[in-house]
């Protein structure tokens, strides 16, 4: 119970700091749109969800540190050990609570964060259209120009309707087999349909040695169909950001991206890290206990708290570092996810066993 109280207090502290900061930043960012304070607070609430979720390991570690320090100051741990209960056994319940909280975070909080983050993107985009990012899509093989001539194309456009796969301000670049640019298509709107892009209100420039002046041979159109081998599933999987994906959808998305020939390393790393999160939370609780339950003769309490806090931060940044290595394919996603909690658990058990030895 003490751990849950410390966890709630620590989370509330971080929430208040990030909420106030986010409200001020959003009010300043959308000042020219004369946004109301209530609307700024609503956007801040949606925006900070991903930040707080990312910082959960630090929040859990600091909560465990606060709980253990209170035990140390009130001599509760001394009484527990005098009753014949080891420090390791006394920390089993808080560690189990942290483990269960890790399960709840990936099962319930993760989908909620994905919904709030996506809602922030939509709401902010309605206020300021410049916040809507352009997307780059590799279009596969298309036929354009001379019969039998195939080109590789890349599309840059702004997604405006996810359900209809409708884009605005589309720039389409077509390349020959040797990588040289052959055509440039500019369209006001582009909609992905069955085996084709339906383009509207645009212009086609032919760029090759046969047309030294592309503007002279340029052709304007109201409607144009550009063949493609892309499917809506492939485009959807390539556009999705991890911030908008629920934990329960990641496996399906990984399979979809691999079938479409799109790299899914980042998604595999995230999925493995989420699976390892309960163990990481439990290990961080034991790390906090390992420093603060040592006898008073070992050193001042302030030094113990500082060392414990630095250790928690070190484990967090080590976890981030291993994820970066995995995303760059230096180590496997499994190693990146499970190495930090394993190291943290080994360190915590070492500390607690030293305490038991006296």
Region spans (language model):
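Short acidic, Gly/Pro-enriched loop/turn segments at secondary-structure junctions
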Residues: 198-199, 211-212, 235, 239
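Short, surface-exposed beta-strand-loop junctions and turns on beta-sheet-rich folds
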Residues: 163, 205-207, 212-213
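Transmembrane alpha-helices
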Residues: 1-150, 162, 228-358
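Generic detection of short hydrophobic beta-strand segments and adjacent strand-loop junctions
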Residues: 215-228
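Residue-level signal for pocket-adjacent positions within structured domains
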Residues: 180, 225, 320
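Signature tryptophan residues that serve as conserved aromatic anchors
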Residues: 197-198, 338
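Structural signature for solvent-exposed beta-strand/loop edge elements and short helix-capping sites
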Residues: 144-193, 199-202
């Amino acid at each position: 119970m003490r751990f849950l109280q410390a966890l709630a207090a620590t989370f509330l502290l971080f929430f208040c700091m990030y909420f106030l900061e986010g409200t001020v930043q959003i009010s300043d960012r959308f000042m020219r749109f004369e946004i109301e304070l209530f609307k700024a607070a609503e956007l801040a609430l949606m925006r900070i969800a991903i930040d707080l979720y990312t910082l959960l390991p630090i929040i859990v570690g600091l909560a465990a540190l606060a709980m253990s320090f209170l035990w140390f100051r009130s001599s509760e741990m001394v009484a527990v050990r005098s009753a014949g209960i080891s420090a390791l056994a006394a920390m089993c319940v808080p560690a189990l609570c942290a483990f269960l909280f890790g399960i709840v975070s990936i099962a319930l909080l993760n989908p909620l964060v994905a919904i709030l983050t996506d809602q922030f993107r939509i709401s902010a985009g309605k206020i300021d259209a410049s916040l809507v990012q352009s997307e780059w899509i590799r279009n596969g093989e298309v036929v354009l120009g001379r019969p039998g001539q195939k080109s590789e194309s890349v599309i840059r456009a702004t997604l405006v309707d996810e359900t209809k796969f409708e884009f605005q301000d589309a720039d389409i670049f077509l390349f020959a087999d040797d990588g040289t640019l052959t055509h440039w298509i500019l369209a006001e709107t582009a909609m992905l349909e069955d085996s084709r892009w339906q383009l509207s209100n645009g212009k086609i420039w032919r760029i090759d040695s046969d047309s030294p002046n592309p503007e002279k041979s340029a052709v304007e159109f109201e409607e144009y169909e550009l063949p493609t081998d892309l499917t809506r599933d492939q485009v959807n999987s390539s556009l999705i950001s991890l911030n908008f994906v629920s934990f329960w959808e990641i496996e399906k998305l990984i399979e979809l991206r691999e079938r479409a020939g799109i790299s899914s390393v980042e998604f595999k790393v995230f999925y493995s890290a989420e699976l390892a999160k309960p163990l990481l939370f439990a290990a961080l609780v034991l790390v906090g206990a390992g420093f603060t339950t040592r006898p008073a003769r070992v050193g001042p309490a302030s030094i113990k708290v500082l060392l414990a806090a630095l250790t928690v931060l070190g484990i967090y940044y080590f976890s981030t570092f291993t994820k970066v290595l995995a995303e760059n394919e230096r180590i496997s996603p499994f190693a990146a996810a499970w190495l930090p909690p394993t190291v943290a658990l080994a360190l915590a058990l070492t500390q607690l066993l030293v305490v038991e030895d006296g």
